């Protein structure tokens, strides 16, 4: 266990950030699953918001930039193929 006040605060803030990151990542994953299961009209409506969510994760370094680019490409191709 940490002995310094700053180390204790860092532990608390890291846990808060970890929970926030997990929530955002899980929410985005659920949105991606819904998009993949949706019909064409519904999927086309959802695509911009899902892409925005993926971009926000990449911007906050929750996922890598290349993973975000790959996801956006896959989702766009999936919706176009419906």
UniProtKB/Swiss-Prot annotation:
Keywords noted in UniProt: Ribonucleoprotein, Ribosomal protein, RNA-binding, rRNA-binding
Extent of Basic residues compositional bias: 1-11
Residue numbers spanned by region Disordered: 1-20
Domain of life: Bacteria
InterPro entries (alphabetical): Ribosomal_bS20, Ribosomal_bS20_sf
A GO MF label: structural constituent of ribosome
One biological process term in Gene Ontology: translation
Gene Ontology CC entries for this record: cytosol; small ribosomal subunit
Family membership: Belongs to the bacterial ribosomal protein bS20 family.
Chain's role: Binds directly to 16S ribosomal RNA.
NCBIfam families: S20
Protein name: Small ribosomal subunit protein bS20
Organism: Christiangramia forsetii (strain DSM 17595 / CGMCC 1.15422 / KT0803)
């Amino acid at each position: 266990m940490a002995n310094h006040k700053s180390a204790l605060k860092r532990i608390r803030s890291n846990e808060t950030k970890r929970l926030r990151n997990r929530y955002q990542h899980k929410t985005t994953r659920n949105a991606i699953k819904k998009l993949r299961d949706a019909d064409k009209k519904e999927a086309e409506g959802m695509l911009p918001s899902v892409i925005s969510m993926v971009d926000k994760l990449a911007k906050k370094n929750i996922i890598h930039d290349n993973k975000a680019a790959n996801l956006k490409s896959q989702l766009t191709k999936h919706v176009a193929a419906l």
